[in-house]
A protein has these predicted regions:
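Hydrophobic alpha-helical transmembrane segments of multi-pass membrane transport proteins
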Residues: 134-143
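Short hydrophobic "helix-edge" motifs at membrane interfaces and signal-peptide entry regions
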Residues: 1-2, 98-100, 145
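Hydrophobic/aromatic residues within the transmembrane alpha-helices of Major Facilitator Superfamily
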Residues: 5, 9, 39-40, 74, ...
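Juxtamembrane boundary at the C-terminal end of a transmembrane helix
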Residues: 172-179
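Juxtamembrane transmembrane-helix termini in multi-pass membrane transport proteins
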Residues: 1-54, 114-135
Length: 179
């Protein structure tokens, strides 16, 4: 949960939260949309991690997970920019817009990759999905409520460095825990 919450700060989905909150000013459907989209996306990612866990020998898995965590550590240092331009909500409203936008924004994102890695490492699909989803909500719900005024004061560079160090430490521990 902490890993995903820290990795999410300054991420494109957090920027998406900020944009949705500023544009539509409807926190409840936005947060519910984040919850539903994240549960769906991270369930798929976690299932992939479980499949990888079952497929690979423990030593091979350890090296892949450790190397992947180190790669995510490097990736965490790169700031995200939100490329999507949101249009007016569909006839289904802000909730559906948020679900679709978040699900798509999470594809191939750091937190989705982290979910795959954590599920492969811990072989506990439900706990990983719940934990990563809570991490997403911890990072995004305050942004929805605080809007741009509070988000402008967050030291994103320092948080990215902290997230990178956390992923690097997890990667190194994973690689060398057998020794």
């Amino acid at each position: 949960m902490l890993v995903v919450a820290v990795a999410e700060v300054g991420d494109k989905t957090q920027l998406l939260s900020l944009l949705l909150a500023a544009r539509y000013r409807k926190p409840a459907p936005i947060i519910l949309g984040i919850l539903v989209a994240t549960l769906a996306n991270h369930s798929v990612a976690g299932a992939l991690g479980e499949w990888i866990h079952a497929l690979l020998a423990p030593d091979v898995l350890r090296w892949i997970v450790g190397g992947s965590l180190l790669a995510v550590a490097a990736w965490a240092l790169k700031p995200d920019k939100l490329d999507a331009d949101l249009r007016a909500p569909t006839r289904y409203g802000v909730f559906v817009l948020t679900c679709v936008a978040f699900f798509l924004a999470e594809m191939g994102d750091k937190t989705q990759i982290a979910t795959v890695i954590l599920a492969a490492k811990y072989h506990a699909l439900a706990l990983v999905v719940v934990g990563t989803t809570l991490g997403m909500l911890i990072a995004n719900a305050p942004v929805v409520y605080l809007g741009s005024a509070g988000a402008n004061r967050i030291p994103f560079r320092a948080v990215r460095i902290g997230a990178s160090l956390l992923f690097a430490a997890m990667g190194l521990v994973t690689l060398f825990m057998a020794y």
